């Protein structure tokens, strides 16, 4: 299935007026927060294939293309919400719960609460809204793809800020993922306050 608005249309048919796409980034990282975004577009824009051309799963775009597309999304969206959950809370409550909290906070941070949600993978039963949860939603739904771009750009920028504060770990390069560079930094310096010490790969570096 190519990316489009099929999922949004399903929610419209079920009575939703405002539909937001929701996605997260950073779930599999060894360090840093998990970040979620919720994005809603005016209905007339969702029905205009030209207006939202180029929006796609953030993983398919270069860093430069994501930054440019994030600017376009901010200009066109009727609402954008963000949710950020720290490594400390991830360690306390687990990545699954942390991801849900980030997504719920993103939805509740929207300027207008939507009637329906298209969510990548996760279900949010705590929110009494119409929902469609689907695998690889960021490759299917324009709204979810937009959320994936906003979340990715926000988190990448945050990791760049962390890198400026403490360049020892190379946050700007690997964004907290378990690359060889990251593993070498962990071996040399040990875990930082940004590391998810509950994650199994960190066990070798935690006293």
Curated annotation (Swiss-Prot):
Q: Which reaction does it catalyse?
A: Endonucleolytic cleavage to 5'-phosphomonoester
RNase H type-2 domain sequence ranges:
17-207
Can you tell me which family this protein belongs to? Belongs to the RNase HII family.
One biological-process term from Gene Ontology? mismatch repair
The Gene Ontology terms for molecular function here are: manganese ion binding; RNA binding; RNA-DNA hybrid ribonuclease activity
Q: Which Gene3D superfamilies match?
A: Ribonuclease H-like superfamily/Ribonuclease H
Under the heading NCBIfam families, the entry gives: PRK00015.1-3
Its domain of life?
Answer: Bacteria
Protein name per UniProt: Ribonuclease HII
| A single cellular component GO annotation | cytoplasm
Q: Does the keyword Manganese apply?
A: yes
Query: PROSITE patterns recorded for this chain?
Result: RNASE_H_2
Cofactors named for this entry: Mn(2+); Mg(2+)
Q: What is its EC number?
A: 3.1.26.4
Q: Which InterPro entries match?
A: RNase_HII, RNase_HII/HIII, RNase_HII/HIII_dom, RNaseH-like_sf, RNaseH_sf
Cofactor note (record): Manganese or magnesium. Binds 1 divalent metal ion per monomer in the absence of substrate. May bind a second metal ion after substrate binding.
Q: Which HAMAP family match?
A: RNase_HII_B
Where along the chain is a divalent metal cation bound?
23-24, 120
Task: Enumerate the UniProt keywords alphabetically.
Answer: Cytoplasm, Endonuclease, Hydrolase, Manganese, Metal-binding, Nuclease
Q: Where in the cell is it found?
A: Cytoplasm
Its annotated function is as follows: Endonuclease that specifically degrades the RNA of RNA-DNA hybrids.
């Amino acid at each position: 299935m190519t990316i489009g608005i099929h999922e949004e249309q399903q929610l419209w048919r079920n009575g939703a007026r405002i539909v937001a796409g929701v996605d997260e980034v950073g779930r599999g990282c060894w360090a840093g927060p998990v970040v979620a975004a919720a994005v809603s577009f005016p209905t007339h824009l969702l029905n205009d294939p030209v207006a939202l051309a180029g929006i796609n799963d953030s993983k398919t775009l270069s860093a430069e293309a994501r930054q440019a597309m994030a600017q376009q999304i901010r200009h066109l969206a009727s609402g954008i919400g963000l949710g950020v959950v720290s490594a400390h809370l991830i360690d306390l409550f687990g990545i699954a719960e942390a991801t849900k909290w980030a997504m719920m906070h993103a939805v509740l941070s929207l300027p207008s609460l939507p009637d329906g949600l298209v969510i990548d993978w996760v279900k949010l039963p705590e929110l009494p809204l119409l929902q469609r949860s689907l695998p690889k939603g960021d490759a299917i739904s324009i709204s979810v793809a937009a959320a994936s771009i906003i979340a990715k750009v926000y988190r990448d920028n945050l990791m760049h800020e962390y890198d400026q504060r403490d360049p020892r770990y190379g946050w700007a390069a690997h964004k907290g993922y378990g690359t060889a560079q990251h593993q070498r930094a962990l071996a040399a310096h040990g875990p930082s306050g940004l590391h998810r010490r509950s994650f199994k790969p960190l066990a070798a570096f935690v006293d």
